[in-house]
Regions:
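Bacterial N-terminal signal peptides that target proteins for export
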Residues: 1-10
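C-terminal motif of bacterial Sec signal peptides marking the signal peptidase cleavage site
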Residues: 17-20
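Bacterial signal peptide processing site
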Residues: 22-25
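Post-signal peptide N-terminal segment of mature Sec-exported envelope proteins
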Residues: 27-62
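Alpha-solenoid helical repeat scaffolds
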Residues: 55-76, 83-591
């Protein structure tokens, strides 16, 4: 019985919200996610929060009276989107800050970012004292992936006395083109120059310099922040991450000291625990999560994180205790049952593992739990129990029946029960006749049994429902190429697939191979070379090598085949081709 409990390091990071490879905010783990902060309520100073100065009442133009009155009635009738459309149009047309402010509040409430951005920009221009409007425009531009424009409003907001979430300005750094990066970097450094005491901006500068692979200057940007506030979470986490990046001996010293100074600060301790887990410091991470549970004994997130760490640390009995405690709390039941199943499977308690997996309901873990339970039943040799297990699962979860049929059939194919798999697909298609995935799966099962008419029938049924399905066009064309002599028909299908998915290596390979069959050798070689450059798979290598060989380019063919066998010595596509052509790799070719 094979051990299916693989390392959970990456899983721990994902489930705990960490990312070990990001170079800009959020770092692993961020004290506050810059992207979500950008969408949150603006953080502004008391000056910015103060009521806006009284302004003269703006008379309503006669042509706006009826639209605005209509908007009022729509608001009373709770037709908010229609009201927003009218209010936005009037606010952008008129010069009335009060109207713009009202429309902006409604746009934010309706989460209409496009209108909210236009209104925030308008309000910032209309009212030179409105810091919140500038902060809102900045946040919405960040969310839209426009940091250069956001920086303009960041500067405006600062000038009006607002506090800004400066690190969020770098959240899209990795996606920026080089010239955009230079512009953003210059603007962020300029903010720091103009507001040298601003801790948020200093942290943004540190993020920037880390992204620029300048760790010493990044740490230098953090030093004044930590000198003024040794417990600043974002600065502590970023400092630790930079130290980790550089392989420093004591990367956690500052945050560890801060936790010691603030033993009841759950947020700080949690970030420290997550940071330790991301660095695979599992023993200390476990201690920190245990301390968090002392502070909040009914916190299911802490229990779950602790259990994952115990699984990773090969402490299955401790993990079982904490996962059961999580179930007793009634929190995260599907995740708890799934990982209980993983633990039992690792302990070779397969009956208990199946029982736990069967209790996982619709969730992120559901389909993997179902697959694992089914594999364990198959490993026991009980095909009847395997099928009954799927019937019971479908009865409990009718909304997932289509996918469950697909998993059942796939697993049967994996153990060469292809005829039984076709029965499952057929039963499923009676219930879901328009399911592309089920019909495609049955087509592949027909091919495995050399039932080419059956395969062709299913693929053509898919194309009847979806004539521009490039995958199916390619599959049918390649099938006709390999199993029939209907090469021109096959070429037409594959050419259409390539029009729909240009540059797709599998389709390039198929088209090159059918052109080879048609005797169009120059075109075949060009297409197969392109496919091989994109995807140096053994099957593509076999095709390209044969096309080169038949074209008289024997030496080039040998180079391709040798390279493929060096990567995969048992590659059947290549070895079968060599055998069929009577070629050995030590063949001497005389030019």
């Amino acid at each position: 019985m094979k051990n299916r409990l693989t390392s959970l390091s990456s899983l721990v990071l994902i489930l705990m919200g960490l990312s070990a490879c990001q170079s800009v905010p959020p770092v692993a783990p961020p004290a506050t996610d810059p992207a979500s902060e950008a969408a949150a309520e603006p953080v502004i100073t008391e000056q910015a929060q103060a009521p806006a100065p009284a302004v003269a009442e703006v008379p309503i133009p006669p042509e706006s009276l009826l639209p605005l009155l209509h908007a009022e009635f729509l608001l009373r009738d709770r037709d908010l989107d229609a009201a927003l459309e009218i209010l936005t149009a009037e606010a952008l047309r008129l010069d009335d800050p009060a109207l713009t402010r009202r429309a902006l509040r409604l746009a934010e409430f309706r989460q209409d970012d496009a209108r909210a951005l236009a209104l925030a920009i308008k309000l910032s221009e209309q009212d030179s004292s409105d810091a919140a409007a500038a902060v809102t425009a900045m946040g919405l531009l960040i969310r839209a992936g426009e940091p250069e424009e956001a920086l303009v409003f960041a500067r405006t907001a600062k000038a009006r006395g607002a506090r800004i979430n400066a690190p969020a300005l770098l959240v899209s750094w990795d996606a920026l083109e080089p010239d955009k990066r230079r512009a953003v970097a210059t603007a962020v450094e300029a903010l720091a120059s103009d507001w040298p005491a601003d801790q948020d901006i200093a942290i943004a500068v540190a993020y920037l310099r880390r992204a620029q692979e300048d760790p010493d200057r990044a740490l230098a940007a953090l030093e004044p922040v930590l000198s003024a506030n040794p417990d600043e979470e974002r600065a502590l986490l970023l400092w630790s991450q930079i130290k980790l990046d550089s392989g420093a001996k004591r990367p956690f010293e500052k945050i560890r000291d801060a936790v010691a100074r603030n033993p009841d600060n759950e947020a700080l301790r949690l970030q420290f625990a997550r940071l330790l887990a991301s660095a695979s410091e599992l023993d200390e991470a476990r201690e920190q999560f245990a301390a968090l549970l002392t502070l909040s004994p009914r916190n299911g997130d802490y229990l779950f994180s602790l259990a994952l760490i115990e699984i990773e640390a090969n402490e299955p009995e401790a993990a079982k205790v904490n996962l059961q405690a999580l179930l007793d709390l009634g929190q995260r039941p599907d995740e708890a049952q799934y990982y209980l199943g993983r633990v039992y499977e690792n302990l070779e308690e397969y009956g208990a593992a199946i029982e736990a997996y069967d209790k996982v309901g619709p969730s992120r873990e559901f389909f993997d739990a179902t697959r694992r339970a089914a594999e364990l039943r198959l490993d026991s040799g009980d095909t009847l129990d395997f099928r009954d297990g799927f019937r019971r699962t479908r009865a409990r979860n009718p909304g997932q029946a289509e996918q469950l049929y697909g998993i059942e059939a796939e697993l049967l194919r994996e153990i060469d029960e292809t005829e039984l798999a076709i029965q499952v697909y057929t039963e499923a298609l009676d219930l879901f006749p328009e399911s592309m995935s089920l019909r495609y799966g049955r087509a592949m099962a027909h091919e495995a049994l050399d039932d080419i008419p059956g395969m062709e029938g299913d693929l053509r049924a898919i194309l009847k429902l979806e004539p521009n399905n490039a995958t199916t066009l390619n599959a049918l064309g390649y099938t006709l190429t390999v199993h029939t002599t209907r090469y021109q028909e096959a070429a037409t299908l594959i050419e259409r697939a390539l029009e729909l998915s240009p540059g797709e290596p599998a389709i390039l390979d198929s088209l090159g191979w059918v052109y080879f069959k048609l005797g169009r050798l120059l075109q075949a070689v060009d297409l197969l070379k392109e496919a091989y450059a994109l995807f140096p798979d053994a099957e593509v290598a076999a095709h390209l090598g044969e096309a080169l060989w038949v074209s008289g380019r024997e030496q080039d063919a040998l180079v391709v085949w040798r390279a493929s066998l060096e990567r995969e010595p048992e590659a059947e596509h290549v070895t079968d081709t060599l055998l069929r052509l009577g070629v050995t790799l030590d063949t001497s070719v005389i030019d």
